[in-house]
């Protein structure tokens, strides 16, 4: 069992892990995504959440295109978070505190700190893959694969 509480022993097609992209469930909501309140709400509904993490001047923030919301280290250690480091300082901090994290830009695959394979859309899947899907159609299609999970703005439709 890893820090997010997941193991690889599971039923893939009927029990795929659903990871909300930045706290979105039914499509992008730029006004609320990556906000602490939205993330807590989505976790309370039973979803995992991918968040974008920045470190600027030894302070930790979340936000997609820029550091927006100042947060605490305790926030990052919540179960069900997948922390996407947006700069090297954030990656170093996340690794130092033991948060579940990863770094990628345009890679087809990247390994998370808990040994999952963060997978770019349309790439080959494995039982360790968590695939990123950009549309509801992509999200629906991946549900019948052997992927461990799916990260999308549309995972609310999958429950």
Predicted ranges, named:
Residues 2, 7, 12-159:
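Phosphate-group recognition and catalysis centered on beta-loop-alpha active-site segments
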